[in-house]
A protein has these predicted regions:
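Solvent-exposed, low-complexity segments and loops of surface/extracellular structural proteins
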Residues: 1-149
Length: 149
């Protein structure tokens, strides 16, 4: 994908509606192509790998640029599944889910001790998470951890 404007290298005041899913890098390029405050990514949203959507514990700069133009963007984490989630991965996923009021879709797995750090449903985004807990959890502490997930 490339945006070209004959005879001009400056940012234009364009109203942009994106019809297909874009990667984080493509979305940033589209967002940067206009000086208008919003870009509508609603039709296709963003679909990319976890590494391209986040940093170690935060949202990537590409995703931040998209979110700045469309705070309700839907996001699909294309890695299936995000295996053996670490505490940092959970923090980054929470940041991604907190960056949009749209739907975040991901398939994840990991140990209960890390996964219980996932933000609860009812925060700013709708979360469509498929979660697999890899370790055995038992007793009241296991029930508490599973309820947190």
């Amino acid at each position: 994908m490339r945006l070209v404007f004959a005879g001009s290298t400056s940012t234009q005041a364009l109203t942009i509606t994106v019809d297909d899913a874009v990667t984080a890098a493509q979305g940033k390029t589209i967002a940067a192509a206009t000086s208008v405050g919003t870009v509508d990514f609603t039709a296709g949203g963003v679909s990319d790998t976890f590494a391209n959507l986040t940093t170690t514990t935060a949202v990537s700069t590409n995703m931040q640029a998209i979110d700045a133009k469309d705070a309700n963007v839907n996001i699909v984490v294309s890695d299936a599944p995000l295996a053996s989630m670490s505490a940092n991965n959970v923090t980054a996923l929470n940041a991604l889910m907190g960056a949009t009021t749209g739907t975040v879709t991901a398939t994840i797995n990991g140990n209960g001790a890390e996964l219980d750090g996932l933000q609860a449903t009812g925060t700013s985004s709708t979360q469509a998470l498929t979660i697999t807990v890899n370790d055995a959890m038992s007793g009241s502490s296991g029930v508490t951890s599973l309820n947190a997930i």
